[in-house]
Amino acid sequence: SDARTKASIPLLRKDFISTEYQILEARAAGADFVLLILAWLEPKRFVELYNFAHELGLGVLVETHTLDEIEIANQAGSKLIGINTRDLQTFKTDLGLFEQMADALDPSAIKVAESSVKTVADVIRYREAGADVALVGEALVTSDPAVLIPEFTSVA
């Protein structure tokens, strides 16, 4: 794909994936990772898609929003787990959700704080709560990425 030829960093297909075909599309397009959203999938279906992606050599970012979903991700052996602080039903965000639930994540997993990032203070707050990575979207669309990216990546 065009993105693959222009990017030297890992690529994530961020979509509401529910079929093997979508995972095959991601692989064919050059993605390195796919997003599986536990709020979108039944646990059995999640495990099937998770295993299928790994069989193709793709990494999986598992998105959670509840403690029950974190438990499912942990039981599957997920090594890249996000806590989405945006409720997909109401679209309300709560930075405190990551702080409340981060300790439930498998200690060996890479912990991803998803959503609610608007300022460098938000990135610092997530980092202090145990996040290894912050997934940023809206802030990059509503602000100047040339300013935000250096600020956000300066948080160690």
Question: What are the residue ranges of the model-derived segments?
Answer:
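Glycine-rich phosphate-binding active-site loops on the catalytic face of alpha/beta enzymes
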Residues: 25-45, 82-91, 129-150
